[in-house]
Amino acid sequence: MARVKRGVIARARHKKVLKAAKGYYGARSRVYRVAFQAVIKAGQYAYRDRRQRKRQFRQLWIARINAAARQNGLSYSKFINGLKKASVEIDRKILADIAVFDKVAFTALVEKAKSAL
């Protein structure tokens, strides 16, 4: 059986990993063995953080809505409860946006929530 030399394949694989590790500090961007581990770990962090990003944005929206609602004399939970009772179906992302950029509209929503309670 003929001897198979794998230099081309190994070189391509190493190049791919080192390209993915470009910009990493020190050996993590230069040494294949270290770079491979760094790329694997980076992938794990990316996978985890794609899920965490959704939670963190929701937390941010809730904090913003709570702050704006309290300026109008209502807690977050009572505000959301009032909106549900008034059958206002605006999600937290849009509510947070309104709270930051359109204070008048948010005040109107708070009044609507208060009247529904």
Swiss-Prot record:
<dbReference type="InterPro" id="IPR035566">
    <property type="entry name" value="Ribosomal_protein_bL20_C"/>
</dbReference>
<comment type="similarity">
    <text>Belongs to the bacterial ribosomal protein bL20 family.</text>
</comment>
<dbReference type="InterPro" id="IPR049946">
    <property type="entry name" value="RIBOSOMAL_L20_CS"/>
</dbReference>
<dbReference type="GO" id="GO:0019843">
    <property type="term" value="F:rRNA binding"/>
</dbReference>
<dbReference type="GO" id="GO:1990904">
    <property type="term" value="C:ribonucleoprotein complex"/>
</dbReference>
<comment type="function">
    <text>Binds directly to 23S ribosomal RNA and is necessary for the in vitro assembly process of the 50S ribosomal subunit. It is not involved in the protein synthesizing functions of that subunit.</text>
</comment>
<dbReference type="GO" id="GO:0006412">
    <property type="term" value="P:translation"/>
</dbReference>
<dbReference type="GO" id="GO:0005840">
    <property type="term" value="C:ribosome"/>
</dbReference>
<dbReference type="GO" id="GO:0000027">
    <property type="term" value="P:ribosomal large subunit assembly"/>
</dbReference>
<dbReference type="InterPro" id="IPR005813">
    <property type="entry name" value="Ribosomal_bL20"/>
</dbReference>
<keyword id="KW-0699">rRNA-binding</keyword>
<protein>
    <recommendedName>
        <fullName>Large ribosomal subunit protein bL20</fullName>
    </recommendedName>
</protein>
<dbReference type="Pfam" id="PF00453">
    <property type="entry name" value="Ribosomal_L20"/>
</dbReference>
<keyword id="KW-0689">Ribosomal protein</keyword>
<dbReference type="GO" id="GO:0003735">
    <property type="term" value="F:structural constituent of ribosome"/>
</dbReference>
<keyword id="KW-0687">Ribonucleoprotein</keyword>
<keyword id="KW-0694">RNA-binding</keyword>
